[in-house]
Amino acid sequence: MLVTAQWLAAHLEDPDLVVVDLRWDEEGRGRARYEEGHVPGARFLDWATDLVDPDHELAFMLADPERFAAALERSGISDHSVVVAYADAGHSGPFRLWWGCGVYGHPDQICILDGGLEAWVGEGHALSGDVPNEPEGSWTPRPGTDLTATRADVLATRDDENAVLLDSREPDKFRGTTVWFETGAIAADADGVASTPRGSLRAGRVPWAVSVPWSRLYGPDLRMRSREELSALFASVGAAPGRRAITYCGVGISASALLYALKRAGIEQAALYDAGWDEWGRDPELPVARGG
């Protein structure tokens, strides 16, 4: 669930509460920014290294259950913990943690600070530079809910009247002028191909996908929109309770926030295509659309 800065301040001393800072930026300064100041008692968790499979051929794929559990345990998280995750407002790392916990059988464990660290500071709460020295937790992965979609699942949505495929990337990536890369967007050439440090990647989108940029999930204050507002947004793109939805982005990060928003709006038959554009754009056998 989403929690407010006021709620977090009132529960900061609860014995089962664990606060995790998932800030990340293209310059790799997440940990340094954490050390400069964070919610008192928060531990730092780097989703881009701690929660991913370092040996997978695709970037940022979800870690296996053992590696994922070890990362949570290093952050002091146990099965009984109430976890509040935050990042910069509008950033999707906390939603990635929420999704991973759901995949591994803890769908209700993660609370997300609505409005991010900006909400905490904006309401007058102090930051701390102290790094807590707390014991490790004990977190048990178990069979989870069906929150993951494959390439085959995405292909199956093409002719399914009861399914919709949603793309959470920014408009330039949906149109195919750039592709996402962790150090910054990379422009595509005249043939619609971007040269990335991991090789060539076609730009564009799955042809039948509908654009729902992650920024539309938030109000002007970068707090997530209400259930009613999200329901109206999703209805406008053909997503509604009783229909299946699959979300994707570049590597499954902003698509995690979109998945969360779908669930918040009561659309339960929803899953994340984790491989995302990093897989789709590299396979010449898969269709791609550009422009629009």
What is each residue range found by the language model?
Residues 52-82, 210-245:
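Helix-loop module immediately N-terminal to the HCX5R catalytic loop
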Residues 59-160, 173, 177-178, 254-278:
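Thiolate-centered catalytic microenvironments shared by cysteine-dependent enzyme domains
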Residues 5-33:
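Hydrophobic alpha-helical membrane-insertion signals
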Residues 37-40, 44:
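Active-site-surrounding "flap" and adjacent substrate/cofactor-binding loops of secreted or lumenal enzymes
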Residues 1-4, 10, 53, 117-207, ...:
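Active-site neighborhoods of enzymes that stabilize oxyanions during catalysis
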Residues 249:
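Short cysteine clusters
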Residues 13, 268-292:
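Extended hydrophobic/aromatic segments used for targeting, binding, or gating
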